[in-house]
Amino acid sequence: MEVTATKGQIIKGKPVADQISENLIKEVDELVKEGINPKLAIVRVGARGDDLAYERGALKRCQTIGIETEVVELAEDITQEDYEKTLRSLNENKDVHGILCLRPFPNQLNEEAIKYVISPEKDVDCFSPINSAKIMEGDKSGFPPCTPTAVVEILKHYDVELNGANVAVLGRSMVVGKPASMLLLNENATVTICHSRTKNLEKVTSQADILVAAVGRAKMIKENSVKEGAVVIDVGINVDENGNLCGDVDTASVQDKVSMITP
């Protein structure tokens, strides 16, 4: 897709998601013709509102694409043994091709132990350490985490040159920062990972052709923190002093300086 960026162009994720869905529908159709009906198992403990909202979104997306789903509802007080037993059963079920464990878990469950139980071949959310390691090695046979993958897909969709680009990733979590850095490195970008202890942070970010903000601090990136004409991907979801949702980037002060920015 050819995009001529004007100053401060807002780039959105929906066209990217729609294109990915279109491609997936074709892939699922081909699998069905071969006698394979892709199925996702969603494992949920209790009935937290955020889990239910995420689950509804996943079910809707799967329905659109043509992927079968099964919701495995577990009691809030489930034991470690019973949770792991449920996962092993899904691992062995040949009719289930993907497993999504909704998190965070209740306190009685040991997340570190659970992530070694899920089958890496069915771990669609990059929960397994094996899939995390594959990202570090540049091995594309595993499942990368969704949000870092979305960052790369958005940049590609809008024809942002990654090969040789100077990229600053603000945040070092295993949820976004580290995997996003590795995925961008695999695209031959030159990546600098920034965090709370980075010296001269503003100097580092203001030299980046592409800035990925994923630190979880409301509007911390201001005009002086970005390079003229840079591309900014704001992953942060925060609440500002007025109680409004906002990102890590102060969009109002940055938009006129950059070439493209996510809302």
Predicted regions and their residues:
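N-terminal amphipathic/basic leader segments beginning at the initiator methionine
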Residues: 2-21
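Adenosine-phosphate binding glycine-rich loop
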Residues: 10, 20-26, 34, 44, ...
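Anion-binding alpha/beta catalytic cores of soluble intermediary-metabolism enzymes, centered on
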Residues: 11, 98-162
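Glycine-rich phosphate/diphosphate-binding loop of Rossmann-like nucleotide-binding domains
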Residues: 45-59, 139-231, 240, 246-255
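Short beta-strand elements in bilobed, periplasmic/extracellular small-molecule ligand-binding domains
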Residues: 62-77, 191-193
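Short, well-structured alpha-helical segments in soluble
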Residues: 82-94
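Glycine-rich, N-terminal phosphate-binding loop of Rossmann-like dinucleotide-binding domains
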Residues: 103, 215, 235-236
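Rossmann-fold NAD(P)-binding glycine/threonine-rich loop
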Residues: 112-132, 236-263
